Amino acid sequence: MRVNITLACTECGERNYISSKNKRNNPERLELKKYCPRDRKVTLHRETK
């Protein structure tokens, strides 16, 4: 069962990326290091609802 998720920057809170994940394989919240255009650097992005 794949669901669409939004990834938000942990430093500025801006929602920069949209992705999908398999809830059966990854039930916990996804965390990835991605580029934040507002901060102009790579920051930790966390899955939001």
Curated annotation (Swiss-Prot):
MF terms (GO), sorted A to Z: structural constituent of ribosome
Top-rank lineage group of the source organism: Bacteria
Pfam families reported for this sequence: Ribosomal_L33 (PF00471)
Keyword NAD among UniProt keywords: no
Segments traversing the membrane: none
Record key words, sorted: Ribonucleoprotein, Ribosomal protein
HAMAP family per record: Ribosomal_bL33
Ribonucleoprotein among keywords: yes
PANTHER family: 50S RIBOSOMAL PROTEIN L33, CHLOROPLASTIC, LARGE RIBOSOMAL SUBUNIT PROTEIN BL33C
Family listed: Belongs to the bacterial ribosomal protein bL33 family.
Leader sequence residues: none
UniProt xrefs under SUPFAM superfamilies: Zn-binding ribosomal proteins
Biological-process GO terms, alphabetical: translation
Name of the protein in its database record: Large ribosomal subunit protein bL33B
Annotated gene: rpmG2
Entry GO terms, CC: cytoplasm; ribonucleoprotein complex; ribosome
